[in-house]
C-alpha cells in the first residue's frame, strides 16, 4: 500500500461522564495516560460492498472496526457515508458496557442498570498529517454525554475511591492542563480528552 495515496480514518466516540463537577477517566496502559472511556465504531456486513468499491483497507486487527485506510480520491464519498449513519453502529451501549462491566468487572450490570446516552457533538473530518503513523489521518470523535441516576453515580464513586481500579476523577482544570495527580504522581491526560469539555455542535463534514 502506498501510504501517500491514502488517509487513515479512526471513527470513534468518547463518553463525557460528569459526577460532582469531575470527569470520569480511565487509564490507558498502552500510552500510560488517562483518557475518557470510549471506543471505535464498527461497521456492518452490509457496508462491505461499498467499502470495497471505494478501495478501503482495514487498519486494525478487527476488520469491522472503523479504523480504515481510505484512498484520497474516495474520501468525499466515504465522509458522506459516515454522515449518513447507514450500515454502521449508531448506538453507544456496546463500548460502555464492555469497558465498565466486561473488561474491568468492577460494577455489577444488574445492580447498575442502563444509563441514558445523548450525543452532544458530532465528530468532524479534519485531515492532518500524523507524524507518529507517517500518514495523512482523520480522527472524527463523537462526544456522548452519559446521564446517571443517583444510585449509578454512587456506585461509580465507590469504584473510583477504592483506588484499586484504572478509573479516576479529573477536574476541568486538570483536563485543560493535560495532567492529573494520582497517588502522589503527576500523570498525563491524553490531549483528545479536552473534547469531552466541548458541547458546541459540529457536523461530520469534510474540513
Regions from the PLM with identified roles:
Residues 1:
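Extended, Lys/Arg-enriched charged tracts that mediate electrostatic binding to polyanionic substrates
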Residues 4, 67-84, 135-207:
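Nudix hydrolase/Nudix homology domain
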Residues 10-11, 139:
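Short, surface-exposed coil-to-beta transition loops
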Residues 11-19:
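Short beta-strand scaffold segments in enzyme catalytic cores
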Residues 21-108:
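Conserved Nudix-box catalytic region and its N-terminal flanking loop in Nudix hydrolases
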Residues 98-153:
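Acidic, glycine-rich loop-and-strand cores that form catalytic or ligand-binding grooves
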